[in-house]
């Protein structure tokens, strides 16, 4: 029964954060949505920040599971990176909570939201880093600083998918994959 209440609270808080954002969500709202007393929330979470942390932690696990679900071991590393990043960015752009948090950070600059979004990005980079380390050990890509490579890979992908489209025709998946392959495997042309 206690586990059910905890789950109800987390689901209600996720809904509230998705609808109203972090700053506008109150524990009273969460209690109403979860159909529990406000005190019940505090038996599981000491404050709103701890509840938010739980939700973001679950979100990161969901994102990693999404990324893992598209990996095809028979494909080259660069194609799997492309598939993985496509899935992660799709998740981020379609998940209501992520949309609201990105919007809140942009419009209000809420510190707690900025920190959690940075945490999500750090987790994605850590995930990519593990995959890059495996690819290096298999000789699929040349050795290098895996943390920097992971960071650049994520930022380059976001730039090609989102930023490029502001002033240019959108790139096809094949074009994005080719650009990433050039930079990841062959490096910058002379």
Residue ranges and their predicted role:
Residues 18, 42-46, 58:
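Base-recognition residues in the alpha-helical recognition helix of bacterial helix-turn-helix
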Residues 61-64, 68, 112-138, 147-151, ...:
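Amphipathic alpha-helical packing segments from all-alpha helical-bundle domains
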Residues 19-23, 74, 95, 138-139:
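Short coil/turn segments at alpha/beta junctions that flank glycine-rich nucleotide-binding fingerprints
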Residues 54, 68-94, 149-153, 177:
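Hydrophobic alpha-helical connector segments
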Residues 89-129:
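Short secondary-structure transition hinges
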Residues 1-20, 24-36, 49-53, 62:
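Basic, helix-initiating cap at the start of DNA-binding domains
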Residues 39:
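Key DNA-contact positions within bacterial/archaeal DNA-binding proteins
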Residues 83, 87-90, 126, 130-138, ...:
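C-terminal peripheral helix-coil segments that are non-catalytic and often amphipathic
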